[in-house]
Amino acid sequence: MKKLSILAVLAASPAMAATGPFLSLSNTNFIVTLAFLIFMGILLYAKVPGRVLGMLDKRSVQIRTELEEARALREEARTILASYDRKQKEVQEQAARIVASARDEAQAAAEQAKADLRASIARRLAAAEDQIASAEAGAVRAIREQAVSVAVAAAADLLSRQMTPAAASASIDESIKEVEARFH
């Protein structure tokens, strides 16, 4: 603080350039210099520079504390950010696994559906082939029955033309005897 006072006195040296006697109360430069020195003396007596320095020291301690808190908060924020980044990576990996699993399950379900469809088509094809075979057998049977019916009708017509009433009576008697012989 003493250095500051000396500096203030030296800064007042241009007051020496004023005209007339310097130590006169009519010289404004002298009055200003004197007032400044008295003001500085009062400040020194009241220990204002010490108080100002104390306040500045307190403020610097407070600023230092706030800076340390800010550093701690920044480190905590970095830690939290790193944690969130790890969690985000884990979530992305889990989502990728879920998508891959769903894709695999969908592919397996599609394969199963294809296999079921093939089996269903094979069953329907077999059933259709069975129906076709049954229809063929029915058609063959109907044709045979029709052929037998036509043959019997033709034979009956042929026999009726060739048979006389006496020959028909003899044939009926012979058939009755043959049936009796087989049942006894």
Curated annotation (Swiss-Prot):
User: Which top-level group of life is the source organism from?
Assistant: Bacteria
Which residue ranges does UniProt annotate as crossing the membrane?
4-24
Question: What membrane topology is annotated for this entry?
Answer: Single-pass membrane protein
Tell me, in one coarse class, where this protein mainly resides.
Answer: membrane
Localization of this protein: Cell inner membrane
Cysteines engaged in disulfide bonds, as pairs: none
One GO CC annotation, please?
plasma membrane
What do we know about how this protein assembles, alone or with others?
F-type ATPases have 2 components, F(1) - the catalytic core - and F(0) - the membrane proton channel. F(1) has five subunits: alpha(3), beta(3), gamma(1), delta(1), epsilon(1). F(0) has three main subunits: a(1), b(2) and c(10-14). The alpha and beta chains form an alternating ring which encloses part of the gamma chain. F(1) is attached to F(0) by a central stalk formed by the gamma and epsilon chains, while a peripheral stalk is formed by the delta and b chains.
Indicate the family of this protein. Belongs to the ATPase B chain family.
Briefly state the protein's biological role: F(1)F(0) ATP synthase produces ATP from ADP in the presence of a proton or sodium gradient. F-type ATPases consist of two structural domains, F(1) containing the extramembraneous catalytic core and F(0) containing the membrane proton channel, linked together by a central stalk and a peripheral stalk. During catalysis, ATP synthesis in the catalytic domain of F(1) is coupled via a rotary mechanism of the central stalk subunits to proton translocation. Component of the F(0) channel, it forms part of the peripheral stalk, linking F(1) to F(0).
Q: Could you identify this protein by its name?
A: ATP synthase subunit b 1
Quote the gene name from the UniProt entry. atpF1
